[in-house]
């Protein structure tokens, strides 16, 4: 049964749109936990477009589930993680001009630098996950860095139409199986919604799904606690999917 990590970046996006103090991501994280979130995820970007350093500091003090810090693989971010000590760091690719993360890390192409960061963080007791596309070459490279976790990028699955989504689901199923064979633990996320999450949640070996935008969007209508509750039902009890005919796994 997969657990649910709630990404609260979009709460901070609303705040930063007016450069004001509300809504407060820290208090919203508490509501997400009250709604059943198994963890809280934030992405501290280099340009600080939404989550700010102070948010991460306060979340470390207040989160009672797990705090997953997404960040670029830079010396500045490693130093922040070593000071804050989140429950997990997820290294993600980052470009200032992107609206949101556009793809997985090229771990195979930067194995040496990523290995050094993984070793530094894990030596400090911080587990590291690498955000990658579900490709065998990248997964093997993740294993070679010494990381214990991967987060599979579900963006292509989320963006696919009905005719190609089954193939994208199959890529994620295969990627999960390969990762497990390598001894890696598997999370997934990006672009998942109430409409498409169940086939991913049903993949055998999937441990956690990190989901943000769709939960925050639904919270406008039903409140954050209820939006989290609604998503957790789907993540933990995925039904047979009519598009694919069976629960994947």
Curated annotation (Swiss-Prot):
Pathway membership: Cofactor biosynthesis; pyridoxine 5'-phosphate biosynthesis; pyridoxine 5'-phosphate from D-erythrose 4-phosphate: step 5/5
Biological process (GO) annotations held by this record are:
pyridoxine biosynthetic process
Gene Ontology cellular component terms for the protein in this record? cytosol
Summarize where 1-deoxy-D-xylulose 5-phosphate binds, as residue positions. 9-10, 45, 50, 100
Major place of residence: cytoplasm
A Pfam family of the record is PdxJ
Annotated site location: Transition state stabilizer: 151
Q: Which residues bind 3-amino-2-oxopropyl phosphate?
A: 7, 18, 191, 212-213
Query: Which SUPFAM superfamilies does this entry report, sorted A to Z?
Result: Pyridoxine 5'-phosphate synthase
Question: Which residues does UniProt mark as catalytic?
Answer: 43, 70, 190
Q: Cite the EC number.
A: 2.6.99.2
Q: Which Gene3D superfamilies match?
A: Aldolase class I (3.20.20.70)
Which reaction(s) are listed as its catalytic activity? 3-amino-2-oxopropyl phosphate + 1-deoxy-D-xylulose 5-phosphate = pyridoxine 5'-phosphate + phosphate + 2 H2O + H(+)
Keywords from UniProt, A to Z, are: Cytoplasm, Pyridoxine biosynthesis, Transferase
A GO molecular function annotation here is:
pyridoxine 5'-phosphate synthase activity
Give the family per the record: Belongs to the PNP synthase family.
Physiological role: Catalyzes the complicated ring closure reaction between the two acyclic compounds 1-deoxy-D-xylulose-5-phosphate (DXP) and 3-amino-2-oxopropyl phosphate (1-amino-acetone-3-phosphate or AAP) to form pyridoxine 5'-phosphate (PNP) and inorganic phosphate.
Q: Which PANTHER family match?
A: PYRIDOXINE 5'-PHOSPHATE SYNTHASE
Protein name in the entry: Pyridoxine 5'-phosphate synthase
Q: Which organism is it from?
A: Synechococcus sp. (strain CC9605)
């Amino acid at each position: 049964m997969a657990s649910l990590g709630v990404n609260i970046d979009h709460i901070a996006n609303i705040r930063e749109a007016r450069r004001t103090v509300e809504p407060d991501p820290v208090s919203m994280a508490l509501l997400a936990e009250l709604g059943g979130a198994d963890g809280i995820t934030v992405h501290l970007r280099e340009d600080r477009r939404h989550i700010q350093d102070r948010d991460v500091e306060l979340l470390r003090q207040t989160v009672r589930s797990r705090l997953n810090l997404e960040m670029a693989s830079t010396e500045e971010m490693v130093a922040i993680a070593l000071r804050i000590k989140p429950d997990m760091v997820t290294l993600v690719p980052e470009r200032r001009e992107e609206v949101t993360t556009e793809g997985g890390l090229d771990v195979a192409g930067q194995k040496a630098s990523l290995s050094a960061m993984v070793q530094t963080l894990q030596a400090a007791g911080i587990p590291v996950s690498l955000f990658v596309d579900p490709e065998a070459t990248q997964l093997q490279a993740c294993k070679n860095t010494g990381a214990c976790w991967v987060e599979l990028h579900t963006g292509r699955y989320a963006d696919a139409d009905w005719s190609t989504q089954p193939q994208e689901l199959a890529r994620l199923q295969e990627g999960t199986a390969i990762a497990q064979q390598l001894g890696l633990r598997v999370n997934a996320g990006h672009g998942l919604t109430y409409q498409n999450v169940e086939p991913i949640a049903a993949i055998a070996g999937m441990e956690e799904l990190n989901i943000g935008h769709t939960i925050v969007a639904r919270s406008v209508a039903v409140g954050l606690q209820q939006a989290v509750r609604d998503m957790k039902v789907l993540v933990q009890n995925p039904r047979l999917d009519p598009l694919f005919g069976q629960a994947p796994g």
